[in-house]
Structure formats: structure tokens, C-alpha cells
Amino acid sequence: MFFVLSIMNSIINTKNMKLSALIFIFGFSISLYSQDKPAYKIFTGEGKKSDYEVLIRVISKADIVFFGELHDNPIAHWLELEITKSLFAAKGKNLILAAEMFETDNQILIDEYFSNLIKEASFESEARLWNNYGTDYKPLLNFAKDNGLKLVASNIPRRYASVVSSGGFEELEKVSSDGLKFIAPLPVDYDPDLKCNKDMLSMSGGPMGHASPNLPKAQAIKDATMANSILKYWQKGQTLIHFNGSYHSDLHQGILWYLNKKNPELKTITISTILQDDINSLNDESKGMADFVILVPSSMTRTYKSAGQ
């Protein structure tokens, strides 16, 4: 009898050991794969590894935060919302949202929608929203609305940017006094030697190609207007987070160039979204691009395809 019990215990122990080994191997495999395929990593502008908690701690002390997104990147859009939630937990009603994706002449529509004067359908039909609004920007707008936060429509109406693209800054002199309310005060400073302006001209086919020298000026009037909108609504003690394409804030140029001309004392923090094949370290050419870099695998899916992609 004792011999039989010993055999049974041995069998049970062997099965338990095998089960434990299988559980360990399974758990290790899950851990290994999850570590091998991160969706993003955070670095400082100098290329040092950072993390989400450090990012939130730093930006919650800033006056103005610029989140430079890639418009078709799902990780950027997800983090925009998550960072907004974390900032709200830290700042409460001292948080303001602002975005390139909404134009200044639509501020009244946002305000009327937030106050429930107009319905969602009316707002969405009139506001000239981006094609990816529903998936990428509506969650931010809804968060602001649901929590009683201000959302600033910061960008110039596209019709005026088109005017500059076609005929230069001089064409804005034809805009009515009512229209000028939606644009940065004229005349607008412009430095053609800024890297962002030179790069814009180069990417568009100039200066040796056929690109119009007015294309960087159209970008500049957007940046100047967004800076003007930020200064119009930000108040001391608040943190304003501005969502824009990374091109508008990379290298602390673009919007920040105009912002610093008006108020150099502002504490600003920039975030840039960058794609790399290997996200374990920041490439040298991306160092200095922003105060924080969100590194995303180049293979990450896109939320939509724009023209030319």
C-alpha cells in the first residue's frame, strides 16, 4: 500500500513540475514578445531614454506644450488623448487645449457646441473638419467638452493661407477688417533663412525647381496665427497643450519662433513624433528636434493615406 501511494505521489509531483514548467515558459514567452514589440519609446531631445511619468511631470510645469504629431500616426493620436487625461489630472481646470486642426473662424462654433447651443450635427456640418476628425480629433474635443475645458481653434482659415500661397503676404492687404480678426496681426515677420522655411521650399521643388517662394510664407502665416491664438487665450498659471503637425514646432521653430518674439519668458516644451526602423535609440539626425521625442516603428500602420503617399 505504501509503495502504491509513493508511486502516485511521484506521478502527481512530476505532472505538477511539468505544469509549472509550461506555465513559466508560456509566461516568459509572453513577456519576451511584449518587450520585443513596443509600439513606442520616449526619449529626451538629447537621446536619453525617458518614460511617460517623467514626460507628464515635466510638461505639467510648462506654460505651453506642443505635441508635434504625424497626422496619420495612430500612436501619436492615442498618446495625445492619454497625455491630455494625465495633464487634466495634474492641472484640472487650469488646462487648455488648442489645435491646428480647427480654424480661428470656427471658434464660435466650438463655443456654441460646448455650451449646448447647437447640436453635434450642426457643428460637424459647418466646421470644415479634417477627414480624420472622427477617429483622431473628436476624442480630444469630446474630452474637453465633457470636462468643461476650453478648446482653442488656433489655425488660420485655409482660404487666407491659400491667398498667401498664391500671391504672398501682400495679398492679405485685400482682406476685410472682419477677416483680419482671424489672422495674426499684419505685417507678419518672416525669415527665409530659418531652417523650417528653407526646408519647406526645398521639399516643394525649390529653389532650383519650380516651387513658389510663397509656399513657406503660407506656412509662416499659419505659424504666426497659431502663435497669436495661443497668446490670446493662455493665462499665467495655466498649461496650454497645442496639437499640431510636428513640422510646426520641430527645432523650436515654426510656431515657437513667433511665440518667442512676442513672449520670450514663456516656458515651452516640445514633443515630436518620429518614425524609425529601430526604436531602441534615437538617431543622431533626430537629436535636438524637440525636448521629448516619441519614437514609433516605421512599420506602424497609418490611419489614412494622404495625397502622394
Region locations from a protein language model:
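Bacterial N-terminal signal peptides that target proteins for export
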Residues: 11-21
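Sec-dependent N-terminal signal peptides
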Residues: 20-28
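Compositional signal for N-terminal targeting/processing segments
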Residues: 33-309
